[in-house]
Amino acid sequence: NFIFHMLKKYPDYRIVCLDCLTYAGNLSTLAPVMDNPNFRFVKESITDREAVYKLFEEEHPDMVVNFAAESHVDRSIENPEVFLDTNIKGTAVLMDACRKYGITRYHQVSTDEVYGDLPLDRPDLFFTEETPIHTSSPYSSSKAGADLLVLAYHRTYGLPVTISRCSNNYGPYQFPEKLIPLMIAN
């Protein structure tokens, strides 16, 4: 949805999508833009440093928006290593590429899961940007680790970064196991 929005709003921008197409990925969703001369799809993982550096050398991006993530809480409990690899190591690879190739802006798409859980009997409570990190699963811990790494790269190397901690993004093409499609189906 982000790619469609950006190509429509900024038709002169070059948009490159790097995606390893895990179980929730579906290349056919990009069919409407595959022939757009300002769009390129690359099937690789953000954990593959050589592939990421090669792509940066070929495309010379100005900015990076990192949507890449393993993002299912239950799956993170079954196999946390995959989450640590993609969400933390992959973020480190992207941050190193941003340093090496002089990226002017990096945006980390995170999750509200880094804040933990709110008590169900307290509807008056809510999260803010100042809420302390209080993770409750390997998934949320891996995303919090990535967020902290991004902030460390900003402080240590001066990289211009932003982080958003969204709650249950939804829209066309969303994988059916995610919250909103699951609620609609049930």
Residue ranges and their predicted role:
Residues 183-186:
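Short, intrinsically disordered, charge-balanced linker/junction segments flanking boundaries
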Residues 1-169:
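N-terminal Rossmann-like NAD(P)+-binding domain of SDR-like oxidoreductases, especially those catalyzing
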Residues 170-177:
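Substrate-binding strand-loop-helix patch
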